[in-house]
């Protein structure tokens, strides 16, 4: 990474990513200027304390930040809107200067590390003794794997597992444990991409890189993949949009000499929009619905940004229930005297899988199962166009999952598919999947009051997330849903169908409540208005019947009434707690 030394770079935006890029360049001997439109961004004190040699400039992003200066490269923070940075970016490109982001630097760093062993990196003093992350040595221990269900055999044992009647054993016994189901088997029938060479090999550092994006479900799937990979016995680092940043995490592992076998990256459309030469081992686009159109300009640009995660040759994991995602699969390439060459991929979805290597859900005798398909007999040669006979492998019952809703079942399938593509064995991952409790504020069960369960989905800040939560949770019971907030210019009409099918009533809050009411007017569901979250919870409780659920999934940003989505969640939880106390229920 000596090519980074003695460079003069400009970083636009002092957020978490901007600070991480400044740290990265400084550690490699560059001269750095950070520019921000804000006079005193929140991380300015941190920048000045950690990196006193870095110059900070506040004010509008104008061409003179690069024109007539010594700057030789420009890097932007992902949250900055293209229109805001356009004067600088356009000027830089006109001068022939490279323009990139944190993902580009991370990709280049991994490419550089392939050329030398991790030991040589340390010997060359390319890493300083201190890390920007105080808990660097614990990064690969991203999940607690102290307990695991005992080894199971067959579908009867899985059914027992679903009811929680299985004896537990230590994590060390699980990594090489028996399959959870006779059908689970090993992974020979699936497109595994094998594990990387260890970091200390002379051949250089060659990790598996797994990348996740999508409008909704990114954080859940990223966190789950990290835990499953670790359960499969591999060292793992989880970074990106989920936090911590890509470069801070890489720096911490370099400092601790703990480069992981597998990287699991959550990437937003902002990070992917201008990414260059990013080629992960395997990647998934979970779904694409309207979001961030004010940033991208239109839906086509938003979809194109998401699709960049697949690079040129990355193994693709696709949501077959989402037409926009399936359109990302390239057209088969015609080859003379051979069948058309299809890009390596597999799919997941809420229905039964239809081709070998795909994942889905199958219902047998009233019990829904996570399943995958394999070719029944791989030794049989088939004629062109002849249908493949499938063997459906039952992996585990949906009831064994602690994360709720059909949408989370498909998230689980996506996580399994991505981890299997990294060469991870299925058996230990199924144990880990059963233990995963989900992420805060994402269809999180917080209380049961008088036989009505209350769910916090405050992270449901767009229509797609709320539609998925309604369909997923509504498959089990009727819902009273709390909607509303700052709508970000979204079209709320896609909520009409899931509300009509799954909601008993809707309570509306916030700035864009009138727009949501208009979109749901024909749904024939009671629409109620509330001036506060406390009133919304009271109205929802009054509308709910025994066995129903109250779902706070606003489909909107929170800034009209709250500090952020976490504050909104806390106010909701406090209101439910107060309701329980009023009704004499101890939580």
Curated annotation (Swiss-Prot):
| Principal location listed in the UniProt entry | cytoplasm
Protein's UniProt keywords contain Nucleotide-binding: yes
The catalysed reaction is: UDP-N-acetyl-alpha-D-muramoyl-L-alanine + D-glutamate + ATP = UDP-N-acetyl-alpha-D-muramoyl-L-alanyl-D-glutamate + ADP + phosphate + H(+)
Q: Where is the composition biased (Low complexity)?
A: 132-147
User: Does the UniProt entry include the keyword Lipid metabolism?
Assistant: no
Which family does this protein fall into? Answer: Belongs to the MurCDEF family.
Q: What does this protein do?
A: Cell wall formation. Catalyzes the addition of glutamate to the nucleotide precursor UDP-N-acetylmuramoyl-L-alanine (UMA).
- Which PANTHER family does this one have? UDP-N-ACETYLMURAMOYLALANINE--D-GLUTAMATE LIGASE
**Name recorded for this polypeptide:** UDP-N-acetylmuramoylalanine--D-glutamate ligase
């Amino acid at each position: 990474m000596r090519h980074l030394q003695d460079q003069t770079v400009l970083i636009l935006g002092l957020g978490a990513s901007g600070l991480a890029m400044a740290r990265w360049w400084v550690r490699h001997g560059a001269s750095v200027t950070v520019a921000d439109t804000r006079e005193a961004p929140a991380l300015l004190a941190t920048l000045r304390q950690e990196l006193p040699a870095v110059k900070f400039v506040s004010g509008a992003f104008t061409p003179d930040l690069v024109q007539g200066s010594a700057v030789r490269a420009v890097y932007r923070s992902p949250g900055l809107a293209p229109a805001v940075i356009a004067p600088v970016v356009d000027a830089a490109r006109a001068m022939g200067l490279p323009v990139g982001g944190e993902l580009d630097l991370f990709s280049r760093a991994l490419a550089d590390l392939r050329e030398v062993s991790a030991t040589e990196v340390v010997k060359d003093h390319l890493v300083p003794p201190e890390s920007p992350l105080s808990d660097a040595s614990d990064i690969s221990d991203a999940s607690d794997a102290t307990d695991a269900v005992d080894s199971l055999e067959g579908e009867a044992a899985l059914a027992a597992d679903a009811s929680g009647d299985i004896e537990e054993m230590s994590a060390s016994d699980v990594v090489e444990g028996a399959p959870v189901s006779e059908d689970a088997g090993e992974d020979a029938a699936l497109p595994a991409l094998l594990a990387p060479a260890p970091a200390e090999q002379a051949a250089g550092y060659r990790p598996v890189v797994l990348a996740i994006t999508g409008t909704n479900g990114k954080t859940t799937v990223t966190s789950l993949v990290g835990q499953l990979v670790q359960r499969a016995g591999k060292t793992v680092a989880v970074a990106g949009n989920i936090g911590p940043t890509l470069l801070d995490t890489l720096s911490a592992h370099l400092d601790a000499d703990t480069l992981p076998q597998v990287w699991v990256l959550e990437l937003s459309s902002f990070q992917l929009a201008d990414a260059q030469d990013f080629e992960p081992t395997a990647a998934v686009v979970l779904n694409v619905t309207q979001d961030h159109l004010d940033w991208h300009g239109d839906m086509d640009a938003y979809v194109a940004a998401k699709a960049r995660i697949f690079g040129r040759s990355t193994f693709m994991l696709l949501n077959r229930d989402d037409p926009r995602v399936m359109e990302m699969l390239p057209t088969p390439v015609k080859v003379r005297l051979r069948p058309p060459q299809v890009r390596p991929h597999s799919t997941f979805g809420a229905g039964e899988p239809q081709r070998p290597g795909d994942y889905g859900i199958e219902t047998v005798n009233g019990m829904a199962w996570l399943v995958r398909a394999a070719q029944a007999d791989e030794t049989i040669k088939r004629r062109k166009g002849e249908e493949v006979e499938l063997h459906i492998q039952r992996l585990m019952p949906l009831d064994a999952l602690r994360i709720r809703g059909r949408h989370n079942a498909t998230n689980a399938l996506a996580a399994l598919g991505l981890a299997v593509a990294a060469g991870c064995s299925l058996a230990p991952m199924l144990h880990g999947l059963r233990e995963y409790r989900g992420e805060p504020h994402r269809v999180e069960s917080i209380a049961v009051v008088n036989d009505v369960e209350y769910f916090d989905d405050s992270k449901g800040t767009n229509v797609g997330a709320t539609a998925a939560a309604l369909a997923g949770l509504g498959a089990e019971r009727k819902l009273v849903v709390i909607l509303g907030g700052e709508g970000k210019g979204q079209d709320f009409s896609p909520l009409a169908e899931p509300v009509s099918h799954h909601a008993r009533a809707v309570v509306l809050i916030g700035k864009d409540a009138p727009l949501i009411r208009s979109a749901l007017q024909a749904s024939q569901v009671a629409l109620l208005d509330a001036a506060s979250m406390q009133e919304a919870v009271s109205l929802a409780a009054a509308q709910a019947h025994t066995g129903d659920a109250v779902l706070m999934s606003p489909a909107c940003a929170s800034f009209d009434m709250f500090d952020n989505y976490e504050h909104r969640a806390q106010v909701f939880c406090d209101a439910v707690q107060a309701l329980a106390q009023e009704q004499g229920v101890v939580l």
